[in-house]
Amino acid sequence: VRSYLAGHANQQAHTTHETSPRAARHPGRRARRGAGAAARAALVGCLAAFVVLPAYAKYDVDIDAPRSIRKLLKTHLDIARFAKRDDISDDQFDFLVTATPQQVRDLTATAGYFSPVVRTDVRTRDGKRDVRVAVDPGPQTVVSTVDLTFKGPVGTEDPKQEAATRFAFSLKPGDPFTQSDWDVAKGAALRQLQARRYLGAKIASSEARIDSRTQRATLAVTFDSGPTFTIGKVDVDGVRRYPEKIVTNVNPLSEGEIYDVQRITELQRQLQNTPYYASVAIDVGDDTSKPERTPVHVKVSEFPYNNIRGGVGYATDTGPHVQGSYTYLDTFGAAWPFTVSGRLDQIQQYGQVQLSMPPGAKGWTNSVLASYTNTNVSDTRIYSARVGVQRTRTGQFIDYAYSLMFYQDRLDQNGAGPTTSRALVPQWAWTRRNVDDPLFPRSGNLIHAEAGFAIKGVLTDQTFIRGYARGQQYVPIGKRDLFVFRAELGGVFTSGSSTGVPASLLFRAGGSNSVRGYGYQSIGNSVAGSVLPTKYLMTGTAEYQHWFNRDWGAATFFDIGTATDAWGERVFYPGVGIGARWRSPVGPINVDVAYGLRNHSVRPYLTLGIAF
């Protein structure tokens, strides 16, 4: 048995970076690889010198260390990385073993352990070598103080930005110190400072002073904000097929406004929301000697004139589906998009044609459209034809839509013959997004509202006013938990029954995005086995989510709702359940199992959980 022992007696070897017996300096971004790099260089030379020697049998390595550093050592220790090679000579093997204690010290230091005890044992049995590396990392260094200082005008011009930068620095007193966390904290704080006004901000100096005796880290970072940047002229590259005026019309930036990365992101989003551009890249000049009216460079890659898209999918409510669309982007030679689209699933068949104008001033888009939908659910069939015009605008936080639509619907049911209704409806729709992350929100809210009316005799069978609203609130609980609340209200206000109102403008409840535990659109006015749409709707959800890691979580929820023609005769349908949550690359995917407390049934649900 050959043993190699390195402990506190050899602390001077693993603290060669120390400036005094008690303290070691680790300037920002300085790699802690001095001894490790030298060892690796020697190893390469040693391997090159002995490549002509006879091959030796492979050896096995067992690393006995706490979980917090075991993976780090298995991944980066040379003796572990070369274990499967069969061309390691005896001298090379001895060098690997000898270098292991210093490599362990270098690696554990990056994880905040500066006084490890390392023991390396080699045993040979039946011609096979077994290497055991035992590591006691000792106490992990923790952050004792954090000193962030700022140079430049940020302190007087924008104290809120300085405060936001301090908040973005993620290492706090009492937190474990690691090299990766130290780098992440500096990077996050710098990006926050650069996000508004101070595009040219930089880290003037940074230092992590480590006291290996007390296992305390004193952190200091000095930021230089540099001057305030303002937005200049937007120039566009890559325009070949479509007018450059499209970029001008959707551009939300004004020359001279203070630089804000969210405004730059909004410009990119506005361009990508148009049908013309496959990709958009934006670069803003960051020359601190010319901060005023800094140029904004936009590079676009255009879609061809003809586009065909298609896809297949599955949803619990509607079953498997297939969908597709064809778009010609240069109708009349004037960049007017003409689109034909359709979707088929088990309960609904849908088709639409739409002709739009290019975005006009301030990004408003005008279009004319016609659609036809055939829906067969809950023993009720609705045939709905629509034609109309609309004017829409999509903003960073708020979307607007104004439309004038003509509806003609036919309703087939079990208890009576078909009924036909029509209406000419001026409508308004408004959506506001105020969340921290548009794809995976943890805080904030989403609100959508609609309003419309129709007057009898004006291509309308029955006078009515229609309103609908839906809201979703996200409330974070600690770092891993989350409450989600959802509410939905709808009403068609008219005298008498709703037989003259187009059925597609009425309401039913039930399903994955409504009241779980009940079938899709199975809550409504039940007549002879048919569930008819109703005048009033109310649903609500309270959901609690716990996330085990960044991507996976679990949920428990309570849903309740009703759909009725007479509010005084309403019946509420509650449901409870549990589910799994996955933050997939395409968006949040929810898998739920719900129990309907009124119908005593269990139903599974699979949904792509994007709100709206």
Regions found by a protein language model. Give the residues of each.
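Gram-negative/organellar outer-membrane beta-barrel architecture
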Residues: 155-166, 260-448, 513-517, 523-526, ...
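C-terminal structured "cap/appendage" subdomains that terminate the fold
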Residues: 561, 567-587, 598
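Flexible, surface-exposed loop regions and adjacent strand-edge segments
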Residues: 150, 238, 358, 383-388, ...
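C-terminal outer-membrane beta-barrel translocator/porin domains of Gram-negative envelope proteins
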Residues: 273, 307, 412, 416-419, ...
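Bacterial N-terminal signal peptides
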Residues: 40-50
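N-terminal secretory signal peptides that target proteins for export/translocation
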Residues: 1-35
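N-terminal signal peptide c-region/cleavage motif recognized by signal peptidases
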Residues: 52-54
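Periplasmic polypeptide-binding modules associated with outer-membrane biogenesis and secretion
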Residues: 57-70, 81-316, 325, 339-357, ...
